[in-house]
Curated annotation (Swiss-Prot):
Record PTM text: Prenylated. Prenylation is required for association with cellular membranes.
Keywords assigned: Acetylation, Cytoplasmic vesicle, Endoplasmic reticulum, ER-Golgi transport, Golgi apparatus, GTP-binding, Hydrolase, Lipoprotein, Magnesium, Membrane, Metal-binding, Nucleotide-binding, Prenylation, Protein transport, Transport
Gene name of the encoded protein: RAB2A
PANTHER family: DRAB11-RELATED (PTHR47979)
Residues covalently joined to lipid (S-geranylgeranyl cysteine): C211, C212
Lineage: Eukaryota, Metazoa, Chordata, Craniata, Vertebrata
Chain positions of motif Switch 1: 37-42
Organism domain of life: Eukaryota
Protein name: Ras-related protein Rab-2A
């Protein structure tokens, strides 16, 4: 289907925080509780609508293991948006955010939009990281912040779409050079069209994989 823009995303964070589950919930609207670990990088895509324009999201789901970190780094370079995910029930995944963020900012373009996601909000009784802590980290580092549940789908749609809205606003403001695909943005065949059909509910294809 024709689109006005293509935005490339990367999903990063420790193993087991639910990165693959978030992607699967967004692209296929389903939750798969048992997964193999993601090996290297997997891929998903979906069309959304922003400001009457079709936007294709091309989403790269990365492995959280240290042994795959060099592979992950190579995907930062062509990303317009990053979803940095931690698990609200595991304090260590929150403590590692600074390392992930430093890595992302070192290897990406300076305008990349980063959404901080506290996942597994359905497991409130096992919470180790307060929502206020996530909000404070996001404020300190200039990130967008949301808590999500890949299991119940709470805020999953919003996390992906709000990231896209932020990228779109930066395009309108002239922050992104849309002629440079290294910024993670590609102009599509529908660019400039005024009458876009709504495809916000259209799913994409996601390779099978782990919730890592």
């Amino acid at each position: 289907m024709a689109y006005a823009y293509l935005f490339k995303y990367i999903i990063i964070g420790d193993t087991g925080v639910g990165k693959s589950c978030l992607l699967l919930q967004f692209t296929d609207k389903r939750f798969q509780p048992v997964h193999d670990l993601t090996i290297g990088v997997e891929f998903g895509a979906r069309m959304i609508t922003i400001d009457g324009k079709q936007i294709k999201l091309q989403i790269w789901d990365t492995a959280g293991q240290e042994s795959f970190r060099s592979i992950t780094r190579s995907y930062y370079r062509g990303a317009a948006g990053a979803l940095l995910v931690y698990d609200i029930t595991r304090r260590d995944t929150f403590n590692h955010l600074t390392t992930w963020l430093e890595d992302a900012r070192q290897h990406s373009n300076s305008n990349m939009v980063i959404m901080l996601i506290g996942n597994k909000s359905d497991l409130e009784s096992r919470r180790e990281v307060k929502k206020e802590e996530g909000e404070a980290f996001a404020r300190e580092h200039g990130l967008i912040f949301m808590e999500t549940s890949a299991k119940t789908a709470s805020n999953v749609e919003e996390a992906f779409i709000n990231t896209a809205k932020e990228i779109y606003e930066k395009i309108q403001e002239g922050v992104f050079d849309i002629n440079n695909e290294a910024n993670g943005i590609k102009i599509g065949p529908q660019h400039g069209a005024t009458n876009a059909t709504h495809a916000g509910n259209q799913g994409g294809q996601q390779a099978g994989g782990g919730c890592c």
